[in-house]
């Protein structure tokens, strides 16, 4: 007779593989699963976990944010390769791009062109695995998760200043009671 485990029919909550059917992503998962198992490196485990994540949990990061992060750190971290498990985007407000070494899942066309023009280097995650199998001389960064427009609406309640989902955005809609002091109360 078998033993009935307490959590018998309960699935594990964390992902063990990406939901996407993208073959290139699956190859990267295969590679980093091997590296996470064979090397005693927390870096590879972190990369693998992030490869499993949904697109909303892999937010983009701009080259201006990466430049700010690398310049703010000490001189030793300026020579490191910045690793992003997500998209690296361009920032037109940034007039001059410093020399950067970035490895990412993907780059926008303009971001790639500007990094290369500045004398920097653009790496894919499989090229990074050849160069730094244990993640040495790298710094792992990610974009802001709450920058999406949808986050403006989450957690609605009194005194939260969250944006309502409105039918229309005219003068008569969502502008009176509860939105201004002169009409009963303001949250």
From Swiss-Prot:
The modification Phosphoserine is found at residues 16, 64, 136. GO terms for molecular function: RNA binding; structural constituent of ribosome. GO terms for biological process: cytoplasmic translation. The modification Phosphothreonine is found at residues 87, 89, 134, 138. InterPro entries: Ribosomal_eL18, Ribosomal_eL18/eL18-A/B/_CS, Ribosomal_uL15/eL18, Ribosomal_uL15/eL18_sf. The keyword Ligase does not apply. Belongs to the eukaryotic ribosomal protein eL18 family. Component of the ribosome, a large ribonucleoprotein complex responsible for the synthesis of proteins in the cell. The small ribosomal subunit (SSU) binds messenger RNAs (mRNAs) and translates the encoded message by selecting cognate aminoacyl-transfer RNA (tRNA) molecules. The large subunit (LSU) contains the ribosomal catalytic site termed the peptidyl transferase center (PTC), which catalyzes the formation of peptide bonds, thereby polymerizing the amino acids delivered by tRNAs into a polypeptide chain. This is Large ribosomal subunit protein eL18A. The gene is rpl1801.
